[in-house]
Amino acid sequence: MLRAGFLLLVLAFLLAPLSGLLGNGFFWQGGALSPQDWAAIATSLIGGAVAMVVIVLAGTPLALYLARSRGRLVLLAEAVVLMPMLMPTLALGILLAVVYGPSAPLGRVFGALGIALTNTPAAFLLATVYAALPTYVVAARGAIAQVPPDYEELARTLGDTPFRAQLRVTLPLARRGLSAAVSLAWVRALGEFGIILIVAYYPAGMPVQLWTDVQDLGLQAVFPLVGMFLLATLPLPLWLGLRARAV
């Protein structure tokens, strides 16, 4: 009984801020979302989906390396992955602008190729990947580390290459943890505000549009977009969680 009461208390603490949506309704005074809100939803969902493809393709090999390797280079790589998670997101946005801005060396290189990395869809993708990639790598590394390497070695004795052994044995066995990693990265990507505010204020995603609505229209104006944010972001984590429990 005491344990159940404690768990209910924790859940109530987490749910308390969300009760504001019930008190104010998903739609403020019965009004609909503005065209800018709908554009922000599309930007976040499309940009977030593309970013997740990049994150999984780039982050999974890195997570495998961190989980299966040893040595000082691994410690250095882990530090590099953790550093973006330890810094304020506004500071990360400023640093990205310094490196990829139009007057920076890398910014000029991409600019010569016709790719602007500030206030463009490409900049939104860059900021989203940079925000969510470390979260995915850390979670995926933990999931892969739980799979005994003996299974990979057994597959290699049966003729698999190291790559095929990881692809056919390790990753399927780590699928529950990898599903959690994808869910965390998805939520992190769609909820990022600080980096995108500096690097990709336009086109605005949902977090930046929420901030703009508060500035222009007041606190009550954000409830429609907050409700849509939850409706847009929750299905993927819930679906992945159900699939992970079903297998």
Predicted feature residues:
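Membrane-water interface segments at the C-terminal ends of transmembrane alpha-helices
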Residues: 1-27, 35-145, 169, 173-194, ...
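Short hydrophobic faces within alpha-helices
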Residues: 83, 150-156, 222
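Membrane-helix/interface signature in polytopic inner-membrane proteins
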Residues: 141-152, 162
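Hydrophobic positions on the alpha-helical face of helix-turn-helix-like DNA-binding modules
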Residues: 154-155, 165, 210
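Glycine/proline-centered hinge or cleavage motifs at structural transition points of membrane proteins
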Residues: 158-160, 172
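Extracytoplasmic catalytic/substrate-binding loops of multi-pass membrane glycan-assembly enzymes
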Residues: 203-205
